[in-house]
Amino acid sequence: MFKVVHKSPILLLLMVACSLALVNIVSASEIKARAAVVMDAATGRVLFAKNPDLRLMPASTTKLMTALVVLERKNVSDVTIVSKKASSAPATKIGLKKGDYITIETLLNAALIKSANDAAVALSEAAAGSEEEFVSLMNAKAIALGLNNTRFINPNGLPGTGQYITAHDLAEIMRQAIRYPLLKEILGTRVAEFSTGKGKTILVNNTNKLLWSDAELIEGKTGYTLEARHCFAGAGERETGTIIVALLGAPSRPLLWKETEDLMALGTRVLNNLEEPVVYLTKVDYDTAKVKKTSYRKRSGKKRKRLAL
């Protein structure tokens, strides 16, 4: 059963007074990200949520859905030719040039490790013929997954009117992504080196810095724009299973990493039956957002900046 917590000073005082067992829950409810969800990767069960259905900008976590749709339509060994539109995508990018020959696998590495926007556009054109048609496929995939509060307008996450996601939906997309061995490998890669096919070698570092500091965090995807702030979806292997953490709208990158690790720890406690699952709502956010509530009670379900990281 879920506890639903609405933030208020009186309620917080009562919670602190009621039970020592609630200390961790109160701590987690004070996270600074605007929305967060912790999910059991095996079942889809939500272990903790703050504003899970609040629609926010996804930034480059969008590229997780891009990867899912591409893998449904293309073989990773397929070669595509980079278009002028893809090569002209704004930063962050790897510097693709019009006419470059490049494999789908290389583009996936660039989009997910470096968070390259040019690679994301090239992937969309390779998979659907045009960026616009690919976006339609992304939204159809979201509907098929039951993601009621997600809508994409591009494959890279750059800001635009009508593009949004929720922490719950982002966690579910991450859960789907790690079912692909190739995506698990890419999202857990610290450093990658690849060629564009014209003799140009590119070395990229993963934007997910937890890969260097948390041995149990096996993969993840960052996101940042000025509008979206700092975002992240990641998966961590714990003794009790794999835990998904999704955060949107964190004030800073260091805080994003700290809250990811804190929520991983909380999720582990819930899986170990040391805490109850909690849905935590910040009233001011819900008063100003139109959301479709998700029924959480029924849901089971290698390590080697304007920017969209």
Where are these regions (language model features)?
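N-terminal secretory targeting signals
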Residues: 1-35, 39-47, 269-309
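Domain-terminus/edge residues, biased toward the C-terminal soluble/receptor-binding domains
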Residues: 148-151, 159-309
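Context-gated lysine
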Residues: 3, 7, 32, 50, ...
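Intrinsically disordered, low-complexity regions
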Residues: 19, 89, 100, 130, ...
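Active-site-adjacent loops and short helices of periplasmic peptidoglycan-processing enzymes
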Residues: 25-168, 172-181
